[in-house]
Amino acid sequence: GLGVNFIENEGPVFTKPIDSPVDVNNLAHFNPSDLDYVYKAVTNIKNSLPDHIPLIGFCGSPWTLAAYSIEGRSSKDFAKTLNFIKANKSETHELLSKYTDACFLYLRKQVQSGADVIQIFDSWANLLKKDDLQAFSFDYVASLITALKIDPVTKNTPVIIFARDPDCDSEVLMTTGADCISLYWTMNNFDIEMSKNKVALQGNLNPKILLEDKETIKKETFKLLSKYKNYPGYIFNLGHGITPDIDPDKVKYLTDIVREY
């Protein structure tokens, strides 16, 4: 294995990152049972929830997994990763294929364990320009979703795709086959008329708004809700994760005003 550890305030760190094509060839086949503790947690959480509250399972996209495992840890520019894929294109595609297969098995087990919805996080989509984004990320996301949609266990499970600040237009995200597109907070030019009645949309609010006063939070939130109020299947959410500097009371205020809208 690659020896991954999750370090507080840093994220995943690999003790044996991928440094060469040989490392890709030597990568062990993923065994879903190695993550039994995840599936047990999914089952326990599902059993603790009221019936009307769905549980979302998730995984990183094949590209995001590749970026972390080549770089070895989070980075400002992922220079090692970008240099690797440029110099080793065929091995990169081999790695992405392996990760796609692993993600499918991992998500399938999550659904078997109680997950009602699946979300795929392409957290490092912003590293790639348009053509590379399609070739190294979205093509593999599409393959993953296709596999989920034809498997008897997962075929009826809704799939959400989140891509961080992607260099693409609306149609490209829709071609992944996802049932719902989670919008990064900068994606303000997304063609909602084109996607209407085809996919659900989620998110788009800048999470840093929660650092502002309540009046500003309400103003920006209502602006967003007004934009999507006639969109069938819009799910209110932030356009990225909540950071530690955000006051939980502001989060409660946000959820309260959304429900009152």
How does the language model describe each region?
Residues G1-E10:
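Glycine-rich loop at the start of a catalytic domain that most often binds anionic cofactors/ligands
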Residues N9-S48:
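A gly/proline- and charged-residue-enriched helix-loop-helix capping module
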